[in-house]
Swiss-Prot record:
The chain crosses the membrane at residues 24-44, 82-102, 114-134, 156-176, 178-198. It comes from Salmonella schwarzengrund (strain CVM19633). The keyword Ion transport applies. Belongs to the cation diffusion facilitator (CDF) transporter (TC 2.A.4) family. FieF subfamily. GO terms for cellular component: plasma membrane. GO terms for molecular function: cadmium ion transmembrane transporter activity; ferrous iron transmembrane transporter activity; metal ion binding; zinc efflux antiporter activity. Divalent metal cation transporter which exports Zn(2+), Cd(2+) and possibly Fe(2+). May be involved in zinc and iron detoxification by efflux. Homodimer. This is Cation-efflux pump FieF. It is a multi-pass membrane protein. Zn(2+) binds at residues 45, 49, 153, 157.
Amino acid sequence: MNQTYGRLVSRAAIAATAMASALLLIKIFAWWYTGSVSILAALVDSLVDIAASLTNLLVVRYSLQPADDEHTFGHGKAESLAALAQSMFISGSALFLFLTSIQNLIKPTPMNDPGVGIGVTVIALICTIILVTFQRWVVRKTQSQAVRADMLHYQSDVMMNGAILIALGLSWYGWHRADALFALGIGIYILYSALRMGYEAVQSLLDRALPDAERQEIIDIVTSWPGVSGAHDLRTRQSGPTRFIQIHLEMEDNLPLVQAHLVAEQVEQAILRRFPGSDVIIHQDPCSVVPTEGKKFELV
């Protein structure tokens, strides 16, 4: 699984970096030629894209290193750090756009030949949609937080390019403040995306539990298994591609130790079939030692 994960995530990071670099060169020319503040917004965003995608590429390679004596749970948390760094990059670009947009609202400047800007923006829009589609497929296959953060960023780029097209069209017909107004709106949306991304990264670093639906699946697998009378103390988290799952099984007091171990092994394999690559720890408890109030399963 780790080889497939690493290959897909690395390809996603390389594709994002290559596309952002190519679009940056095109946008530099378009901004120089038209003077559009909306295109400047897109240019700044491309700079952030490159920095974020390069960070992803380096961090993903580090996160895929196997566990060692100093990092016995692996290096998957590096992905969350990359997502947090991206949120900081994006917040900085949003603040820059705020200042530039306000300045152009106060003193609007007519742009040169909006048609060039429209052509460049259409190219950027098509390329970004293709990239986001590929990233969404990678996220569905790997659940990589770093690629998900990158995808959220490029999804905001799709909306941004659409807004730029409208702004350039309005400017073409003489409404010069539209350029700055749309750039300001883009900045607000980018900042919102950055804050959401940062929140998700922090939650991962704080070892947030797996989603309720996944935990319920684990509970259903465990409690329906022959030989298991009940279960409690389910604890879960995720680091990079690896889910960490801990659970206590409740078994009959007179069940031989070898048989209890065999049942636990079967339950572990069933969980791994549903969540491949997980790190599963199962503890067996005799029913008589489990407090009555602890037998009711809750998602904790």
